[in-house]
A protein has these predicted regions:
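N-terminal Rossmann-like FAD-binding beta1-loop-alpha1 element of flavoenzymes
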Residues: 5-32, 395-400
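Short hydrophobic core segments
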Residues: 8-10, 33, 131, 144, ...
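Glycine-rich active-site loop/strand segments that organize a redox cofactor
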Residues: 48-94
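A glycine-rich dinucleotide-binding beta-alpha-beta segment and adjacent secondary-structure elements
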Residues: 127, 300-377
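A conserved short coil-to-beta-strand element within the FAD-binding core of flavoproteins
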Residues: 127-141
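A conserved FAD-binding loop/helix module that cradles the flavin
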Residues: 156, 160-166, 171, 375-401
């Protein structure tokens, strides 16, 4: 192969733009073919418009099919990804739970530096070019054909778009059908009566069904109660782990063991019942007893989950059930909610059919796949964008060789 390596990147999203810059930096002649009128539009929607770039701690266990991409994740760590963006001039800040954002708190800043990176590395960006076919050329290379009749030739092709799975299927790759993940969950709403709009921090355990004794996954974070069920980042994470019939158990007192909870509520009962008897000549009711524990509406929901009414007078015999409800508030999952707003889709080409470091196809040498093209999805908190950047860096550098 004489002269510069010709690389065509199919898709001008997060992973595609990074792949293009890295390939161009390595000396390749790079063209990006984007079907939309502008590149990087999905980047602008990430992180509620703030763009959660990556996470300070990324492990293969954070991903579906993480074992298939372990070498890549080790090579292209958060430090290396942030180094790439630092070279493009982006400033960042780290927030709670390791989430890393641009210092500007604006996703358009990230897209701006990626566009600039393409410009300064002479990447030829062509929008309105929907690729419909990739054909092998003889003796080597590929012909990339667009819906509008345009065609391009390349020594290497990087498929960096979710729509590229059809292209990979035509090349013989195994495709897992797409389905939404990282979205709210519909649940049985009876236990959630009166909680719509309330936020509460909890340790959430997911069980595959009502009979399971060991959780499939455990997460801690803020839960948002909705009229259809549960939302919030911790619930988005759980949507990757559970299906219909699963049970979510919310522990509103994760910092206390069951024994410590028993002690807390017993001491509170002794103190409050003595005061109520002396002042009012009666026992406190459960609304009075739960005051100060959680949000008022969460207090009432816990009492009802324990099998009581908030207006009932509290007795010592009630306390174990109150503790059990506070540390094991249960809601059965009935499905996914707001799937049209899902942050990520699960599915794509099997990553096991690609090199675990370079992402070159094991079936079609010279073809690479990145980002959402592959059946890899991660937790909330910057993990999915990290995969986009890291996979783009890996494929771009490898394709230029």
């Amino acid at each position: 192969m004489g002269g510069r390596v010709r690389v065509v990147v199919v898709g001008g999203g997060a992973s595609g733009l990074v792949a293009a810059i890295c390939a161009a930096r390595a000396g390749a002649d790079v063209t990006v073919l984007e079907g939309a009128s502008r590149v990087g539009q999905k980047i602008l929607k990430t992180g509620n418009g703030r763009c959660n770039l990556t996470n300070a701690r990324v492990e293969p266990a954070d991903y579906r099919n993480g074992a298939a991409i372990m070498p890549l994740l080790e090579e292209f760590s958060p430090t290396r990804v942030l180094g790439f963006f630092g070279e493009l001039g982006l400033l960042v800040s780290e927030e709670e739970e390791g989430r890393i954002y641009p210092l500007s708190n604006a996703a358009n800043t990230v897209l701006d530096v990626l566009r600039a990176g393409c410009k300064w590395h002479a990447v030829d960006v062509r929008c309105g070019q929907k690729v419909v076919e990739i054909a092998r050329m003889q003796p080597d290379g590929y012909r990339i054909i667009c819906a509008n009749g345009n065609d391009f030739s390349a020594d290497r092709v990087i498929i960096a778009t979710g729509g590229g799975t059809d292209l990979l299927a035509s090349l013989g790759h195994t495709i897992e059908p797409f389905s939404p993940v990282l979205c709210p969950l519909k649940t049985d709403t009876r236990p959630l009566k009166g909680l719509t709009g309330v936020r509460a921090r909890a340790r959430v355990s997911a069980f595959v069904d009502e009979d399971a004794t060991e959780p499939r996954a455990v997460r801690y974070g803020e839960v948002l109660f909705r009229d259809y069920g549960l939302s919030g980042i911790v619930i988005f994470d759980m949507s990757r782990e559970v299906g219909d019939g699963a049970v979510l158990s919310l522990d509103f007192l994760p910092q206390l063991s069951p024994g410590q909870c028993d002690g807390y509520f017993s001491a509170k009962y002794a103190s409050l019942s003595a005061s109520a008897s002396e002042l009012f000549g009666r026992a406190p009711n459960l609304t009075e007893f739960m005051c100060g524990c959680f949000h008022t509406r969460v207090n009432d929901a816990v009492v009802r989950a324990a099998g009581f009414k908030p207006s009932e007078s509290v007795t010592p015999e009630m306390l174990p059930r109150i503790v059990a409800a506070a540390k094991g508030f249960r809601a059965q999952v009935t499905g996914l909610a707001e799937t049209g707003q899902a942050q990520v889709t699960r599915g794509g080409a099997s990553p096991w059919e690609f090199d675990s470091l370079t992402l070159e196809s094991r079936l079609r040498p010279g073809v690479y796949a990145t980002g959402e093209t592959l059946d890899v999805d991660g937790r909330c908190g910057g993990f999915n964008l990290h995969w986009a950047w890291a996979s783009g860096m890996a494929a771009g550098a490898a394709a230029a060789k």
